[in-house]
Regions:
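Residues within HEAT/ARM-like alpha-solenoid scaffolds
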Residues: 234, 262, 297-300
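C-terminal engagement modules used by replication, chromatin/transcription, nuclear envelope/ESCRT
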Residues: 291-335
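Feature representing long, continuous alpha-helical segments
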Residues: 241, 265-269, 273, 303, ...
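Long, compositionally biased intrinsically disordered regions
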Residues: 1-190
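Positively charged, polyanion-binding regions of nucleic-acid-associated proteins
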Residues: 236-264
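Short acidic, hydrophobic short linear motifs in intrinsically disordered regions
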Residues: 257-274, 278-290
Length: 335
C-alpha cells in the first residue's frame, strides 16, 4: 500500500532526571483517579504538565551552557528559584524572587548561543548530544572548512550592496573584529544577530509565560504591567493545592503508596528538594552569607506559605506547638 512502516527511534529526554520526576508525578496523580472528581483530576493534570514544561525549560536554560563548558551532561543539578508566597508585588520577599528570574532572563542569550553551537556540530557530525558535547569541548576546530562553507553560503545569498537590506558589506563590517579564521565564532555571531536569534528570545519568553500560567491561580511566574514589578517566581493557590496532593503520598516498603501528614517545614523542604523551589532559604548554601533583611524575608515567606495553605483548606491551627501543626491529606488512599 506504499505505507512507510519504518519508525524513527524516539529520542531520550535531554534532562533524564527531570523527565523521570514528571513521570513520577503523573503516577502519583493517577493514584487519585478513583477518588477525585473528573474535572478536578483533569485540572491537576493540566497544572502538572505546565509546571514541568516550565521547570524543564528553566533548567535547560541554566544547565546547557554549563554542559558545553564541561563537555558532558553529567553535572550536578543545582538549579533553584525563590518563590514569593505573599501575593504582594511590593513584599519584602519580592526583590529576591525577582532577582532569580532576572538572572535567568540575563542568560537567555548564552542559552540561545549554546543551542546554535549544538545545532552546528550536529549538522556537521550527525551525532547524538553526548558526543556533540564532548566534541565541542575536546575537538571542535573553529577554523574548519565546514563552518567556512556555511558562512560563505550565507554571505553569497546576501545582496552585494543594498541601502535598505542587510548586505555583504554589512556582514563584513559586523565580523571585522573576529579572527580571520574563526569561522565557527563568526557563524554563531551571524545567527545570534539575525532575525532568527531575536525571534528565539521572544518565543522563549512567551513560551515560559504560557507554560508557567503567569498571573493565574496555577502560576509559577507573576508580574504586573508596571516595570516596577517584573517577573518573579511564585506558587499560585491551585498549583500549591496540586503539589500538596502529591507530596502527602509516601511509598511503603512493598512499593505501594499511602497518604501521610506533613508539618509546614516538611512540606516546604519537600517542595525545595523535589522541584528546586525555595520558600525558606535560611538553611540554603546559596544564602550562607544572607543578611538580617534576607532572613526576615524568608520568615515572612513562611508565614505567607502557612496562610496560603490555610486558605486552600489544607491547614488548621490546632496548637501553638510546631510539631502539631500538620498538613492533612484531603483524600486518603486507605479509605
Amino acid at each position: 500500500l506504499g505505507v512507510n512502516t519504518s519508525v524513527d527511534a524516539t529520542p531520550l529526554p535531554f534532562l533524564r532526571d527531570q523527565a523521570a520526576l514528571f513521570n513520577d508525578d503523573i503516577r502519583r496523580l493517577l493514584l487519585y483517579k478513583e477518588r477525585l472528581p473528573r474535572t478536578v483530576f483533569i485540572d491537576y493534570l493540566r497544572i502538572l504538565c505546565g509546571l514541568h514544561l516550565a521547570l524543564y525549560t528553566m533548567k535547560v536554560i541554566y544547565l546547557l551552557p554549563k554542559m558545553i563548558a564541561e563537555g558532558t551532561r553529567e553535572l550536578k543539578d543545582d538549579w533553584s528559584m525563590i518563590v514569593d508566597m505573599t501575593d504582594n508585588l511590593d513584599s519584602i520577599v519580592a526583590p529576591y524572587a525577582c532577582k532569580d528570574v532576572e538572572r535567568m532572563e540575563n542568560s537567555y542569550g548564552q542559552y540561545i548561543r549554546s543551542t546554535y553551537m549544538i545545532d552546528l556540530v550536529q549538522d556537521r557530525k550527525h551525532c547524538g548530544i553526548d558526543e556533540t558535547l564532548r566534541y565541542l569541548k575536546e575537538e571542535n576546530n573553529e577554523s574548519g572548512e565546514y563552518y567556512e562553507m556555511v558562512l560563505n553560503a550565507i554571505c553569497n545569498n546576501l545582496p552585494l550592496k543594498d541601502d535598505k537590506e542587510f548586505d555583504q558589506e554589512d556582514m563584513e563590517e559586523m565580523l571585522q573584529y573576529f579572527n580571520q579564521n574563526d569561522y565557527f565564532g563568526k557563524l554563531l555571531h551571524v545567527l545570534e544577530k539575525s532575525n532568527l536569534g531575536s525571534g528565539q528570545r521572544k518565543y522563549l519568553i512567551a513560551f515560559l509565560d504560557s507554560a508557567s500560567m503567569k498571573n493565574s491561580p496555577s502560576m509559577l511566574l507573576a508580574d504586573s504591567r508596571s516595570k516596577r514589578h517584573p517577573r518573579r517566581g511564585v506558587i499560585g493557590s491551585k498549583l500549591l493545592e496540586t503539589l500538596v496532593q502529591l507530596l502527602v503520598l509516601r511509598q511503603r516498603e512493598d512499593g505501594r503508596y499511602e497518604t501521610c501528614s506533613l508539618s509546614i517545614d516538611e512540606l516546604a523542604n519537600a517542595i525545595r528538594k523535589r522541584y528546586g523551589l525555595i520558600i525558606n532559604g535560611i538553611d540554603e548554601e546559596r544564602f550562607a552569607d544572607a543578611d538580617v533583611e534576607m532572613n526576615a524575608a524568608f520568615r515572612t515567606n513562611m508565614e505567607a506559605f502557612k496562610n496560603k495553605l490555610r486558605q486552600i483548606g489544607f491547614y488548621t491551627d490546632m496548637s501553638d506547638a510546631c510539631i502539631l501543626q500538620k498538613i492533612r491529606p484531603r483524600y486518603k488512599l486507605e479509605d
